[in-house]
From Swiss-Prot:
Similarity annotation: Belongs to the intron maturase 2 family. MatK subfamily.
Intracellular or extracellular location(s): Plastid, Chloroplast
The protein's name in its UniProt record: Maturase K
Species for this entry: Apocynum androsaemifolium
Pfam families given in the database record: Intron_maturas2, MatK_N
Function: Usually encoded in the trnK tRNA gene intron. Probably assists in splicing its own and other chloroplast group II introns.
Superkingdom assignment: Eukaryota
Record's keyword terms, sorted: Chloroplast, mRNA processing, Plastid, RNA-binding, tRNA processing
GO molecular function, a single term: RNA binding
A GO CC annotation given for this chain: chloroplast
Gene: matK
Annotated GO biological process: mRNA processing; RNA splicing; tRNA processing
Length: 505
């Protein structure tokens, strides 16, 4: 961010409304490539950096505004350089540069908001790290789940209209509108099988994610409002406390006035759902109550989105299910809500009573069957989970073989350290350990038993460290104090970056 300010010299107190002139600045594209936005394009086109000039960008924008330029047939695509290979190259340049420019005002706004102390920021609710407290929170009062599939926008113009509330620059929005429309039209001329929206998703990922996140955040505004009004985790400053008193006062007044006419609809406003999380195109809501209450929430949200955001949510894509009968795939984890019996001892005078209460608890388990299938595909074991050797690695040295197996084992241990039950994780580590031993024994033309007896059974413990040892290396000062706390479940916030398991469907 300091690098951007050094080039742009923008004042934080002013909202940068005029972003259109920045598109013609050559250093914008140099900054975009300097942040490793899309290195695949550089590999496919070696001379890509040399073509990022003011003249090419200006010519491209001029061509986009010439409507007759796009009225070509499929046979002329080989003769027209813009419809051919250069069209993809220039469009990627504009999309990367535009996405980098549009992020500038949002970065400025985020920095200015962080400087204000004592104000609750709802942006934290939309972070991917909000999934971890969702997985560990108490589910004792929730019995119903509403699973909503987030639909794609029916038209690309909706993405531009969503961005219009954030960027007050008409020329930039017009350029984005022309770019999306004409670029998708050119794609339909070349290949009519791929829709323009899907093609934009695959070929211009950074621009798509930027527009799609704004699109999702707009319709999520109702969730943020309900969470900020009903959450008990907000800071207790004077302004927030007064706002909370006014909110509950309005609810009580509403209940007194309309209790006679609408006695069954009060719970819809008095007890909103308390859990919300979004992951991989799904919105998941947890609430307490009956199925009738969730159906009311479902109808209310669908009508609210259709009337205010032009978001068409089909009723068949919104599922209402019982919490304790539903499993959920989250970031490579298999999450299952189970009822755990809790025994409470109560004593009155000389009589003692044992009260058993079932409590819903979310167990994050390691998906052992998909992992064994992946290991079998990678030739670490067979389909039954029995470890086998890897003949491909017998040409390597012993240290390289152990380092490669140990890196995979430590990565999985690091990733699945937040699982509530470690039995499946230990089985995965056993498969890797025995596969490594069989590979080394095959290299030295010996049996596994003789190889382990000759070197000892502890020769692999150095690189197969457990999650507690990883935590002790990461936080050496506090590990001794919180040894018992972090022995069961440890969440590492960087697992979404170091492992592709978080992005699997």
């Amino acid at each position: 961010m300091e690098e951007i300010q050094r080039y742009l010299q923008l004042d934080r107190s002013q909202q940068p409304s005029f972003l259109y002139p920045l598109i013609f600045q050559e250093y914008i594209y140099a900054l975009a490539h300097g942040h490793n936005l899309n290195r695949a394009i550089l590999l496919e086109n070696p001379g890509y950096d040399n073509k990022s000039s003011f003249l090419i960008v200006k010519r491209l924008i001029t061509r986009m505004y010439q409507q007759n330029h796009f009225l070509t047939s499929a046979n002329d695509s080989s003769q027209n350089p813009f419809i051919g290979r250069n069209k993809n190259l220039y469009s990627k340049m504009i999309s990367e540069g535009f996405s980098f420019i549009v992020e500038i005002p949002f970065s400025m706004r985020l920095i200015s908001s962080e400087e204000r102390k004592g104000i609750f920021q709802s942006h934290n609710l939309r972070s991917i790290h909000s999934i971890f407290p969702f997985l560990e929170d108490n589910f004792s009062h929730f019995n119903l789940m509403l699973d909503i599939q987030i639909p794609h926008p029916v038209h690309l113009e909706i993405l531009v209209q969503t961005l219009r509330y954030w960027v007050k620059d008409a020329p930039s929005l017009h350029l984005l509108r022309f770019f999306l429309r004409e670029y998708c039209n050119c794609n339909k001329i070349i290949s009519t099988k791929k829709p323009g929206f899907l093609f934009l998703t695959k070929k211009n990922q950074r621009l798509f994610f930027l527009l799609y996140n704004f699109y999702v955040c707009e319709y999520e505004s109702i969730f943020v409002f309900l969470h900020t009004q009903s959450s008990h985790l907000r800071p207790t400053s004077f302004g927030v406390f007064r706002e909370r008193i006014y909110f509950y006062g309005k609810i009580e007044h509403f209940a007194e006035v309309f209790a006679k006419d609408f006695p069954t609809n009060l719970c819809l406003f008095k007890y909103p759902f308390m859990h919300y999380v979004r992951y991989q195109g799904k919105s998941i809501l947890l609430s307490r109550g009956t199925a009738l209450l969730m159906n009311k929430w479902k109808s209310y949200l669908v009508n609210f989105w259709q009337c205010n955001f032009d978001l068409w949510v089909h009723s068949r894509r919104a599922y209402i299910k019982q919490v304790y009968n539903y499993s959920l795939d989250f970031m490579g984890y298999l999450s299952i809500v189970r009822q755990t019996p809790l025994t409470v001892r109560s004593q009155m005078l000389k009589n003692a009573f044992l009260i058993k209460n079932p409590i819903n608890k979310l167990d994050t388990l390691v998906p052992i069957i998909p992992l064994i299938g992946s290991f079998a595909k990678a030739k670490f074991c067979n389909l039954l989970g029995h470890p086998i050797s890897k003949p491909v690695r017998t040409d390597l040295s012993d240290s390289d073989i152990m380092d490669r197996f140990g890196r995979i084992c430590r990565n999985l241990s690091h990733y699945y350290s937040g699982s509530s039950k470690k039995k499946s994780l230990y089985r995965i580590k056993y498969i890797l350990r025995l596969s490594c031993a069989k590979t080394l024994a095959r290299k030295h033309k010996s049996t596994v038993r003789a190889f382990l007896k000759r070197l000892g059974s502890e020769f692999l413990e150095e690189f197969f460290m457990s999650e507690e040892e990883v935590f002790s290396l990461t936080f050496p000062r506090v590990y001794s104090l919180f040894l018992g706390v972090y022995r069961s479940r440890i969440w590492y916030l960087d697992i979404t970056c170091i492992n592709d398991l978080a992005n699997q469907q």
